[in-house]
């Protein structure tokens, strides 16, 4: 399927896309890599992106896949937190002329967290400040992607209630964020401020941005999504505690 999408796009005249469970990018990887190498702007819609819909068990739950796809040069892995960010990701994908895009989507329902004109949404820059500290300068920055942005927002509320100003950054795309100016990147991830990442996947590459990482460094488990996430530590309370442990 992914190879066919690449062939249709390379032929010209049609913008093709294909979709499957995100876990099955294991079978798609060679064709995704060839699309990236050939600067072919294919679009892939990959769903069931975490243990958040957990009844199928670990065979169908991606954990290493976000890192594996981000590791391929010239691939835009875009994992939105809500419908507004998804629309922004589609816009970026359709405007791309030399880069394949993976839209990595949840299957479970998510709240709408972001605001902004879809014609110019800050998610198009790869990462942006979704929630600023309530008062004063942030002492900690919580970086979330996809369905875990809501976890970061809830953890922020816990920290603020404890007197710790916290910022939430939504980072749907490392690829797009790295293309921004140094000034913009520093305005989002302020130097000197402790950072915690939260993503329902392996934490291997997150030290690039974060001082501490909340993730899943093991295979998943078969359980309702909410229970699976709790068992694996993807909870607001755990994220807030990890942030507190970073601070003097």
Walk through the language-model features, giving the residues of each:
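Solvent-exposed alpha-helices and their adjacent loops that cap or buttress functional pockets
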Residues: 9-10, 35-38, 44, 68-71, ...
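Short, surface-exposed connector motifs at secondary-structure boundaries
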Residues: 11-17, 72-75, 135-140, 165
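General beta-strand structural signal in soluble alpha/beta enzymes
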Residues: 17-18, 44-46, 77-81, 103-105, ...
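Thiamine diphosphate
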Residues: 1-67, 85-88, 95-248
